[in-house]
Amino acid sequence: MTKQVRIVVLTGAGISAESGIRTFRATDGLWENHPVDEVATPEGFARNPKLVQRFYNERRKQLFSDQIAPNAAHFALAELEKKLGDNLLIVTQNVDNLHERAGSKNLIHMHGELLKVRCVKSGKIYDWQGDIGEHDKCLCCTPTQILRPHIVWFGEMPLEMEKIQTALSECDYFISIGTSGNVYPAAGFVREALFYGAHTVELNLEPSQVRSSFDECHYGKATELVPHYLAQFL
């Protein structure tokens, strides 16, 4: 393969599951035993900000556990970026930092990041590694405003969609890794890439909801599938 091949990779919870990151269980609508509308919607935050902050504080702490680390799939993507540079774009639905820890740099967190918070009024974003408490305020506003997790909740617009759609229109390969295919707009990316002529590939533990839109599908563990498939580009 030449260095000029352009690849967009979409990653979902499946790539981080083997690293020990707990995932949202869509089948029963629970996220770590919390109803989604309580902890992952703007309305839930308005009703009970303490509960929401506590929920994300616990998820943030999880990232610093000795048991959480990038796996072979994350490292394979980072290695491919060394060769392709800006011709590889990773778009992740995950809010963890495992891609960064593996070495990936050309990366879009379309659903936000656990290690960032933002002001509810100005939208100013801050790096944040500890807990968010009720006394933590954004000092950029007068009067001071509360901080919220820099997470895209249900009902909110994903981040950097214009950049993502441009990349989908220009890529030669679209590779989806560890995604369910039931969360939009990400589930529609494969059809966009197909429309513009990309070769589409699904690497998943099991078939996704949009498997029929892929030119090529391979099923198994991400830690095995991803390094093996990406080797052809190295």
Swiss-Prot record:
Q: What is its EC number?
A: 2.3.1.286
Q: Name one GO cellular component term.
A: cytoplasm
Positions with a binding annotation for substrate: Y56, R59
Reaction(s) the record says it catalyses: N(6)-acetyl-L-lysyl-[protein] + NAD(+) + H2O = 2''-O-acetyl-ADP-D-ribose + nicotinamide + L-lysyl-[protein]; N(6)-succinyl-L-lysyl-[protein] + NAD(+) + H2O = 2''-O-succinyl-ADP-D-ribose + nicotinamide + L-lysyl-[protein]
**What gene name is listed for this protein?**
cobB
Q: Which terms in the Gene Ontology molecular function aspect does this entry carry?
A: histone deacetylase activity, NAD-dependent; NAD+ binding; protein-malonyllysine demalonylase activity; protein-succinyllysine desuccinylase activity; zinc ion binding
What family does this belong to? Belongs to the sirtuin family. Class III subfamily.
Listed Pfam families:
SIR2
Q: What class of enzyme is it?
A: transferase
Query: The organism sits in which domain of life?
Result: Bacteria
Annotated positions binding Zn(2+):
C119, C138
Per the annotation, which location comes first and is thus the protein's main one?
Answer: cytoplasm
Protein name, per record? NAD-dependent protein deacylase
What organism, scientifically named, is this protein from? Answer: Pasteurella multocida (strain Pm70)
PROSITE patterns reported in the protein's UniProt record: SIRTUIN (PS50305)
Free-text comment about domains = 2 residues (Tyr-56 and Arg-59) present in a large hydrophobic pocket are probably involved in substrate specificity. They are important for desuccinylation activity, but dispensable for deacetylation activity.
Q: Which UniProt keywords apply?
A: Cytoplasm, Metal-binding, NAD, Transferase, Zinc
